[in-house]
Amino acid sequence: MKAVGVVVEYNPFHNGHLHHLTEARKQAKADVVIAVMSGYFLQRGEPAILPKWERTSLALQGGADLVVELPYAFSTQKAEWFATGAVSILAALEADALCFGSEEGTIEPFHRLYHFMAKHRLAWDRMIKEELDKGMSYPTATSLAFKRLEGSAEHLDLSRPNNILGFHYVKAIYDLHTSIKAMTIPRIKAGYHDDSLNESSIASATSIRKSLKTKEGWQMVDRVVPSYTTEMLKSFEKETTFLPSWERLFPLLKYRLLTATPEQLHAIYEGEEGLEYRALKTIVSATSFHDWMTKMKTKRYTWTRIQRYATHLFTNTTKEEIHSVLPRGTESLPYIRLLGMTSRGQMYLNGKKKQLTTPVITRPAKVDDRMMNLDLRAAFSYYASFPPSLQQKRLKEEFHRTPIRIDHKPEPKKEA
């Protein structure tokens, strides 16, 4: 059986994701789609709007055959480590291809850029340091340094978020010496960071999350997500009375900051360049998460960088812990956690069982590993603001729930 991989967050699952899954299967001529999905906290340093189990169910209904978890150590990271973790998992599962959405829309420019950057790596690193020394944020420094390289204007636009991630997927495929074939499809209509809905049936996850904050917005969201996503969001909000967000977690984050020392905050992953002192200085007067973020943000610290630091602070994840679990070179991962599958996905795993060298696990009780401990701590942190009875139920689920089984259902047509 031929397998294509996709790397996803589904925050939440929308029509653009449905298009991506359909096109990935078609372009790769694949029998099976493997979705590597972030768990409770995401790449931009924010809690997922739905727990991973609900998002796994949506992924399976949307066309994925296997859903496996991208561990916390990779999911809340810069693009390079995020991509490395995802590609490592797909390589371990012997995926034939990886299909990602990008603003570029064709794959050859990504390969050309990889070879160009390999040739100019030392010069690029030196120029990045020069830009950082001027007080630039890391993303700005990398972008400015890239533009300074002779010949860079002929290459891929790395100022676009999905092009950046796509480049790192391709880079990881080369660096890990895998046989995975990289493929890309153009992102349609909505940009990654677009924050408002329009008349299109395609919208960004950012605009959907923003719209879910109002009653009118809920009605508009129905147009840009499959019906099963709407049903899942309504069902979850009915059970909890809220959708997870940083604002919901802010009182706990504020307590964490106010009871920590600068030394403790410096030990937290991504706590560098005086970020810990700025966090302590600004938290006292902050009245909300957005207020605190506005006070924290400078030319040097991007919104995403601060959110990632906040996530690691909230989960009490240290530099030492992350550095101890990140793989070196082509070192294999300790395990792959299976969250859900269809009968076709199960057939694929059964066929590969004897040749896979990385264990595929279904419950954390079956493994004692530092990477898994970080995942469990992320779950404890995510559920910290839930009502006690629901929190107990969810945490028990985290240890004992077996993979979700769903076979694809056709999406019912909506009334015009």
Curated annotation (Swiss-Prot):
Subcellular location: Cytoplasm
Binding site for ATP: 7-20, 101, 162, 187-188
Main location: cytoplasm
Gene Ontology molecular-function annotations: ATP binding; ligase activity, forming carbon-nitrogen bonds; tRNA binding
GO cellular component: cytoplasm
Top-rank EC class of the record's enzyme: ligase
Protein role: Catalyzes the formation of N(4)-acetylcytidine (ac(4)C) at the wobble position of elongator tRNA(Met), using acetate and ATP as substrates. First activates an acetate ion to form acetyladenylate (Ac-AMP) and then transfers the acetyl group to tRNA to form ac(4)C34.
Family: Belongs to the TmcAL family.
NCBIfam families documented for this protein: PRK13670.1
The protein, known as: tRNA(Met) cytidine acetate ligase
Species the sequence originates in: Halalkalibacterium halodurans (strain ATCC BAA-125 / DSM 18197 / FERM 7344 / JCM 9153 / C-125)
